[in-house]
């Protein structure tokens, strides 16, 4: 949590600088700051916090990403219930295939002792938090400038992570070249580039379509964890990855034109 606290505090500082230099408009209503703060804490602090705490409790990075890959199903169901978004038949099939593919890989990895129940529980909490933040962003934060909006969200997430860091760690950090490199990557690529891209996608498409892209996170994470951490890929895992990618393709594929 200390790492996340530093990440969000520094990301907030960068976004503030950009917002001031380019004179981006700030929200005028106080309620907008509350909505942005709720999204920031849910999506950034609790979402990634659940992932980090799960990994800290001996769950493998690949398995952690695979569990988070179940988020599209939860998001699609929640969007249908609370935001009345409709799903085409092929999208329902795609979500089911994606779920099956992720479940296949997660089950295979857990059978190999790659995770613990507490680690899975924290990851599930993170998945629910990411879903909540995504829906809240779609419902409450549309029309707000992405730079100033992200500044408020990272400020709220940073404060929350600072408080939680004292509950789950000593609040101390050991700075090494690897840690500094990871921090720079998470700030520039994940907190800035990826966050702006996510918010743009949410503003352009349905929650189910955007969330289905999260199915690709487990595939990429498992492939990256193979050479970096020595986490093996079994036939079951590879099969699950293929099924997952087919499912995502069905969800995001544009609907065909109705023949005349």
Task: Place the predicted regions along the sequence by residue.
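Hydrophobic transmembrane alpha-helices of multi-pass small-molecule transport proteins
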Residues: 15, 78, 87-109, 127-130, ...
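Specific alpha-helical transmembrane segments that line the substrate/conduction pathway
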Residues: 2-13, 43, 52-86, 126, ...
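Specific transmembrane alpha-helical segments of multi-pass solute transporters/efflux pumps
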Residues: 16-68, 104, 187-205
């Amino acid at each position: 949590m200390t790492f996340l606290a530093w990440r969000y505090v520094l990301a907030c500082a960068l976004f503030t600088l950009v917002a001031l230099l380019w004179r981006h408009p700030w929200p005028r209503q106080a309620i907008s700051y509350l909505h942005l703060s709720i999204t920031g804490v849910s999506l950034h602090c609790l979402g990634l916090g659940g992932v980090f705490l799960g990994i800290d409790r001996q769950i493998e990075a690949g398995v952690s990403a695979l569990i988070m890959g179940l988020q599209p199903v939860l998001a699609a169901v929640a969007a249908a219930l609370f935001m009345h978004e409709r799903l085409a038949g092929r999208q329902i099939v795609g979500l089911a295939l994606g779920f099956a593919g992720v479940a296949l890989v997660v089950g295979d990895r857990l059978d190999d002792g790659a995770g613990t129940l507490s680690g899975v529980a924290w990851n599930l909490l993170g998945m629910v938090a990411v879903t909540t933040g995504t829906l809240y962003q779609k419902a409450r934060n549309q029309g707000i400038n992405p730079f100033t909006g992200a500044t408020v969200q990272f400020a709220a997430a940073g404060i929350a992570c600072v408080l939680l860091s004292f509950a789950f760690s000593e609040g101390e950090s050991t700075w090494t070249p690897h840690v500094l490199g990871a921090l720079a990557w998470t700030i520039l690529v994940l907190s800035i580039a990826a966050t702006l891209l996510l918010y743009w996608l949410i503003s352009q498409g349905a929650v189910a379509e955007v969330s289905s892209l999260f199915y690709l996170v487990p595939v990429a994470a498992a492939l990256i964890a193979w050479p970096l951490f020595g986490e093996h890929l079994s036939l079951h895992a590879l099969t699950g990855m293929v099924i997952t990618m087919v499912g995502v393709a069905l969800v995001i594929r544009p609907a065909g034109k109705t023949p005349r």
